[in-house]
């Protein structure tokens, strides 16, 4: 990409922000993770509708195909403008696992909803008595035919009250050493 192409892209990003980052949305963004789901979804939808929601995803799964410089331009411009943070759990954590390791059925079921923001995810790592010491996880997933039965607790789960789904680390092998047997 030439420097004039990058300059044009930067102008496009600034114009987009000027059009979609309203004063009320900018004020809501100052709350960080405290932003309401409705406000978070409004910004997510605007970025999604522009085709810019997943700059780190492969194009075949809905990514932008941007260069590192384009990603930097977008990231810097939205941060400097005080735009809401796109909730990272689906786009940055769950989506890449699904498009890399998921079945075609899982990709079809989850990736479009992560991209369009209609489903929000949260992470389930910390547990009572173990905090973020993942080797001491007690929540277990026990195989029951084709399914797993999960039993345990998670705490300190950022945005759990706004999420539709949780991705959780669970112990699937109780015989393994503590650092292993976690899925």
Where do the PLM segments sit?
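Amphipathic, small/basic residue-rich leader segments at the start of a protein or domain
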Residues: 1-88, 99, 105-116
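Short, solvent-exposed loop/turn elements at beta->coil junctions and helix N-caps
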Residues: 60, 126-130, 155-156
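Short, conserved phosphate-binding/catalytic loop or strand-edge motifs used
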Residues: 90-95
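A short, Trp-centered hydrophobic/proline-enriched beta-strand micro-motif
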Residues: 117-125, 169
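A structural signal for short hydrophobic beta-strand segments in well-ordered beta-sheet cores
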Residues: 139-142
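A short core secondary-structure module
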Residues: 147, 151-183
């Amino acid at each position: 990409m030439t420097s004039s192409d990058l300059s044009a892209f930067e102008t496009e990003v600034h114009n987009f922000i000027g059009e979609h980052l309203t004063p009320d949305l900018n004020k809501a963004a100052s709350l960080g993770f405290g932003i309401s789901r409705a406000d978070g979804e409004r910004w997510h939808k605007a970025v999604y509708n522009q085709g810019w929601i997943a700059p780190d995803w492969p194009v075949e799964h809905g990514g932008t195909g941007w260069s590192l410089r384009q990603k930097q331009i977008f990231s810097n411009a939205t941060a400097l403008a005080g735009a809401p943070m796109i909730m990272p759990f689906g786009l940055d954590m769950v989506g890449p696992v699904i498009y890399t390791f998921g079945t075609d059925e899982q990709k079809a079921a989850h990736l479009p909803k992560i991209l369009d923001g209609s489903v929000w995810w949260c992470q389930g790592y910390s547990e009572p008595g173990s905090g973020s010491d993942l080797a001491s996880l007690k929540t277990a997933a026990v195989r029951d035919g084709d399914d797993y039965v999960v039993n345990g607790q998670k705490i300190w789960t950022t945005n759990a009250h706004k999420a539709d789904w949780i991705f959780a680390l669970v112990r699937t092998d109780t015989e393994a050493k503590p650092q292993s047997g976690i899925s």
